[in-house]
Amino acid sequence: MPKLIKIKKGLNLRMIGEATGQDPIPSIPSRDFAIIPDDFCGLSPKLLKKEGDHVTAGEAVFHDKNNPEILVVSPVSGIVSSIVRGARRKIEALKIEADSQQDHVKFDAEKFADIKAALLESGLWAFFRQRPYGIVPSPEATPRDIFISTFDSSPLAPSHTLLIDNNEECFKKGVEVLSKLTAGTVYIGCRKENLIETDFSESFILSGPHPAGNAGTQIASIRPVNKGDVVWAIEPETVVKIGKLFTDGYVDWSCVVAITGEAVKKPTIVRATEGICISALLKDNVNIDKSPRIISGNVLTGTNVGPGGYLRFPFRQVAVIPEIINDCEMLGWASLSPKKYSASRTFFSWLAPKTRKYHFDAKINGGERAIIMAGEYDKVFPMDIYAEFLIKAIIARDIDKMEQLGIYEVVPEDFALCEFIDTSKLELQKIVREGLDYLKKEMN
C-alpha cells in the first residue's frame, strides 16, 4: 500500500459554480487559436513561421534562442493569421486560423529509441517544468526525480478522471517513458479514491486541503529540492500525450476543459483543442449582468484574459467570476455578515457547515501596504519554509538569504494561497517569479 501523506496546512475555497459529474460535451468548434510564448517560462522565442504561412498540427512555430532544439508546436493545422507583438517587439501571441480538416504531423517510430529527441521534436519537451526556477528544462539536464500530480486541488478544478481523460493505459505508457529520463524515481501523487500504480514509478497518497495537489507541495513532502538538485514536474495530461506519442506516433492536442464560476450560466465540461479562443468556449454561457472577469486557469493562479483571450497552459479550466458583487456595501468588512467568507474567522460564517459555498468576486478590499509579520502565510503554506522571510529576502534581492530560506524549492503557484489571504495585498506570485528570474540570471 502506498504511503499516506497528510497535508495539514492549506485552504479549500468553497466557491459557487463547480462543474461536476458530467461527460465532456463533444469538441467545441472554432477556427481561432493562439500560442502564447509566456506559457513557456524560461524560453526566448525565435519564430520559425511568418504571417501567411501554413502549419500542420504538431509542426514547430518557434524555438528557444538559447536551446534551438526546444520546439513549440502548433496544436492545429491552419494559416498563421497574426503575430502579436508588445513592448520592445516581444512576441505576445501567435494566432492561427484553423483549417476545416485537420492534419497531424506523423513521427517515425524508429527514432523513438532516442526518447529525448522524440520529446523535443514533438514539442512535448516544452511542457516539462524544472525546479529550481520553474522553467522549461535544458535538454542537457538530467533530473534527480520526476513528479506527477494526478489531481488538482485548486478551486473549482476538474476531477482526476477528466485530467487523465480516461486514458489510463496511455498514462502508464507515458510514465514508462519518463522513467528512462531519470536515474532516480518517477513519483506519482494521488488521492486515495483515484490511486494509480505502475511498474515504473512510486505512488503516494495525499490527503488534505489545497495545495495538496500542487507539485511543489508533493515534492516538499516526498523528497525536497536542495541546492544543486534538479527535479522536473509534469502535468498528467501531458503524460497521456507522451504515452499517445510512443504508442500511435502522433500527439493528440485535444484537452478537456472545465467551464466554471459563479458568472457562468451553466458550469460544464467541454472537449476542445489547446489554445482555443475563449469566446468559443463561453458562447452564450456567461451572465453579462455580473460584469464577468474571465480567467484562463483557476482563480488563484490563472490569467485574466477577457472575452478576446485564449485558453492558456495548463489548458484545463476557465473560471468566470463577477468583478464586483456589491460596490457600495454598507459598513464593508465591519458588517460582520454571516454570508461573507473569511479565512481568518473575521465573520461568523466559520460556524456554517463545511459544505456551504460562498460568493466570491475580484475585489481585493484594500490596497498594497507594508508586510505584516503575523505568521498568516504559515497557516496555508505547507512547506517547511519561512514564507514571509523568504518574500522579504526576494524583495531585497538578497541572494544568500534567498538560498538559505529555500527559494530553490518554490515556484509562484506555491504562494497563491498566501497571496489570497495576504493582509498586505502584495502580488506575491509576481514577486516570486521576478525573484527566480533574478536568481537565475545571477547564478548562470
What are these regions (language model features)?
Residues 1-48, 63, 203-206:
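N-terminal, Lys/Arg-enriched amphipathic/low-complexity engagement segments
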Residues 36-40, 50-52, 64-66, 83, ...:
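Acidic/polar N-terminal loop/beta-strand segments that form early-domain functional surfaces
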Residues 39-45, 55-58, 67-82:
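Generic structural motif
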Residues 29, 41, 66, 264-266, ...:
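Residues that act as N-cap/strand-start positions at coil-to-secondary-structure junctions
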